[in-house]
């Protein structure tokens, strides 16, 4: 008997062959499966007819026959081959009886015997709980249903139209799942009909499913039924782009959560290792970290609840596949059991909370189940309902939209009982932009919006392909050229990146993002004159931006006009307050430039100010103070006539006994040791790493007259002191 893995591989290969027009190769794959589904004689008969008809066609053409409809016949044979392959695959899969699909199918047969009995029960008088159970069974019936005829499509469309909207959406999910596992053109037709529903929620759910099925069965897209005309209207074309955007947002949400987890792990790792004590600052850091990421997710529309998934989705309620597609509303039995008190009244406070909670349906249902079946959750709910009713005036209740649909699907494909056996659209490299007939429905703004998310995910090749395609169709825009430039910069093609930025500037001369991008590019290349030019442009557009004058002053310093830079920094210092953001950087810049200009008094004054602002915790300031004091020592020695070149350190007086003017050497050593202690404490590094930082300054110090021999002595002093071997 064939195993499940081989079955999938043979089927997939055959589907690709039929879809690409290699009908003989597709038939060969089909013939491989026929011995394993011999009980379904109709499949073998239809497969034999398919092969005969194709050979008749080939022989006819070979012998000089002419048929203007030959391509139509060819496409029809392709569709027949695909259908037969999927039927054979499903038949063999059921015979293997090795997964939840088979279990659901067998359970329906055991309980109901057939479709008619199940639908009769659905139409009988049922309690809400009984109706929910039967609805789940109808979901399983549609999910595991065999391949449809046109009559089946008509029957189920009529059936769905008789149900209320929430039932339609739930059972629509079953058809989507059935199609995800085994492509069926007739079921695709039904989804197309549902996409034309007047109910917005039904419409966007079907639209989303139709788009994802194109990713799932990408090789079969040419053989799929055309999209409904309503979807191709100008307004609905926008929604196709939104489907892709929301899918990519989920991947960015995932990446953002991973980034948060790494940062949190770094904090907790230091706590658990004992390198940092648990104190108020640690707790504050953790809360601040969480708050920062939460604000970012809310602003960007990212999923804020991914971290709750392990808790919610392991509950018993989510073991039933149909529950992953269940729409949530207040008529749901779970809501009724939790939110309605013994007197039949709705618990107002908790109801307000459920209305406002930013959760997709899957999360809401799982949470309500836990509330109903977990004592701790129940206690928390009771306490909440006893609180004063919150004022929700002006609150915005989230609308069920594409974002929640995509969040539900992300959870299904990543955590449902079926996740291990299903192809995951969130792990596919293919996007809707890769389909030419769909890409043309993306406006240039839509394309850029999706491509920016692809850029964030590191899919640079796809970004370039999408941007080049849309520019060729609609012409360039500043945002498209800017994004292309960012890709070029990531690929270290700086000349091309700058070219894109300059072209974007021509289209929008005052586009701040473009100007900032060019500033960054020129700074990266060390082309400081051009960097300064674009900083000046930004300053002209944003005269109230306090950060730009500092950047301009720093860039003037980089081009070698240090006196001018220092004067500008002095002016900024005069206008600034120690409470201003970035004031410590301002003092640091003045100290650095003053040191470079050998204005040691100014450098020392601003370095002391920098240390005061940081409570002595800034290692860069301690390092600079060491340089200043060492240079003062050098100046003193240079101005004093040399009397005795023979130095006996043992016979010299203790440094503390020397006069005050002779302590620069010791003061320099003290500053360097404070630098090492501060650096090691902040970076959890060995002292050797800090000493290497000191070594990076040797070129500057030697250029100002400090002897390498003295620098070597200082380095040995620092190493010996750090190791504890120096008395």
Where are these regions (language model features)?
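Short coil turns that delineate tetratricopeptide repeat
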Residues: 38, 475, 509, 543, ...
């Amino acid at each position: 008997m064939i195993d499940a893995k081989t079955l999938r591989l043979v089927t997939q290969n055959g589907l690709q062959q039929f879809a690409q027009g290699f009908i003989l190769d597709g038939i060969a794959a089909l013939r491989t499966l026929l011995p394993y589904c011999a009980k379904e004689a109709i499949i073998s008969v239809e497969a034999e007819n398919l092969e005969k008809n194709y050979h008749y066609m080939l022989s006819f053409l070979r012998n000089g026959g002419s048929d203007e409809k030959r391509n139509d016949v060819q496409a029809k044979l392709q569709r027949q081959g695909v259908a037969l392959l999927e039927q054979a695959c499903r038949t063999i899969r059921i015979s293997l009886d090795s997964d939840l699909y088979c279990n659901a199918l067998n359970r329906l047969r055991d309980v109901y015997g057939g479709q008619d009995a199940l639908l009769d029960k659905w139409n009988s008088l049922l309690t809400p709980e009984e109706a929910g159970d039967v609805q789940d069974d109808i979901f399983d019936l549609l999910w595991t249903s065999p391949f449809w005829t046109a009559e089946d499509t008509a029957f189920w469309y009529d059936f769905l139209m008789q149900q209320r909207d929430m039932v339609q959406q739930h059972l629509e999910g079953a058809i989507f799942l059935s199609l995800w596992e085994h492509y069926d053109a007739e079921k695709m037709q039904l989804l197309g009909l549902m996409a034309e529903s007047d109910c917005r929620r039904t419409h966007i759910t079907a639209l989303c499913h139709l788009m994802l099925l194109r990713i799932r069965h990408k090789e079969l897209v040419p053989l799929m039924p055309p999209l409904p005309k309503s979807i191709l209207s100008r307004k609905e074309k926008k929604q196709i782009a939104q489907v892709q955007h929301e899918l990519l947002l989920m991947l960015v949400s995932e990446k953002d959560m991973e980034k948060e987890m790494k940062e949190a792990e770094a904090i907790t790792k230091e706590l658990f290792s004992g390198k940092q004590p648990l104190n108020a600052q640690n707790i504050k850091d953790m809360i601040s970290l969480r708050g920062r990421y939460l604000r970012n997710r809310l602003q960007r529309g990212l999923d804020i609840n991914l971290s709750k998934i392990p808790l919610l989705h392991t509950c018993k309620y989510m073991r039933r596949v149909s529950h992953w597609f269940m729409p949530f509303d207040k008529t749901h039995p779970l809501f009724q059991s939790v939110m309605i008190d013994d007197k039949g009244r709705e618990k107002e406070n908790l109801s307000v909370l459920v209305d406002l909670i930013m959760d997709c349906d899957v999360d809401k249902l799982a949470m309500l189940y836990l509330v109903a079946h977990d004592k701790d959750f129940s206690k928390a709910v009771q306490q909440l309902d006893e609180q004063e009713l919150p004022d929700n005036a002006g609150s915005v209740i989230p609308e069920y939209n594409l974002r929640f649909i995509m969040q539900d699907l992300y959870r299904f494909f990543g955590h449902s009982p079926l996740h291990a056996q299903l192809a995951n659209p969130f792990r596919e490299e293919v996007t809707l932009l890769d389909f030419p007939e769909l890409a043309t429905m993306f406006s240039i703004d839509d394309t850029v919006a999706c491509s920016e998310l692809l850029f964030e995910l590191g899919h640079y090749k796809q970004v370039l392909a999408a941007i080049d395609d849309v520019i060729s169709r609609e012409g360039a825009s500043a945002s498209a050229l800017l994004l292309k430039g960012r890709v070029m910069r990531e690929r270290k093609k700086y000349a091309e990146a700058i070219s894109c930025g300059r072209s974007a500037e021509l289209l929008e001369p005052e586009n701040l993002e473009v100007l900032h991008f060019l500033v960054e590019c020129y700074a990266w290349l060390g082309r400081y004159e051009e960097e300064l030019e674009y900083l000046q442009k930004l300053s002209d557009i944003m005269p109230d931006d306090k950060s730009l004058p500092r950047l301009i002053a720093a860039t003037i310093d980089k081009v070698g006009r240090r006196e001018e830079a220092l004067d500008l920094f002095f002016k900024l210092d005069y206008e600034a307050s120690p409470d201003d953001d970035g004031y410590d950087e301002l003092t640091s810049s003045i100290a650095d430039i003053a040191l470079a200009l050998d204005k040691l008094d100014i450098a020392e004054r601003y370095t002391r100010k920098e240390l005061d602002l940081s409570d002595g915790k800034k290692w860069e300031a301690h390092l600079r103070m060491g340089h200043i004091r060492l240079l003062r020592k050098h100046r003193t020695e240079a101005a004093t006539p040399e009397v005795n070149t023979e130095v006996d350190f043992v016979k010299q007086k203790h440094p503390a006994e020397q006069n005050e003017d002779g302590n620069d050497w010791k003061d320099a050593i003290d500053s360097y040791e404070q630098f090492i202690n501060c650096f090691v404490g902040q970076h959890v590094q060995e002292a050797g790493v800090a000493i290497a930082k000191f070594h990076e300054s040797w070129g500057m110090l030697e250029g100002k007259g400090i002897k390498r021999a003295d620098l070597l002595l200082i380095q040995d002093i620092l190493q010996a002191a750090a190791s504890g071997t120096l008395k």
